[in-house]
């Protein structure tokens, strides 16, 4: 299953985070250890979006927790599917035959 994880840092916390570049690199390293499909950083806001392919949420608990601690906010976690995978999911759910 693919998951999209999105975190945002408010301006006040952002100043604290930017003063700890080693913590930012540590967080990025934890996500990179999962070989993400993609990692994106907003150029206009303090946001980070990561897309991982994992069997379940347990696989990325450590970087998720590190993100929560660093940003002082709960990241959003969305299970997602590609347009090619979506019909199979609908079929498993009994929505289409």
Regions found by a protein language model. Give the residues of each.
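Short S/T/G/P-rich N-terminal loop/turn motif that feeds into the first structured element of a domain
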Residues: 1-47, 55-58, 80, 84-97
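Conserved short beta-strand edge segments in small beta-sheet-based binding/regulatory domains
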Residues: 70-82
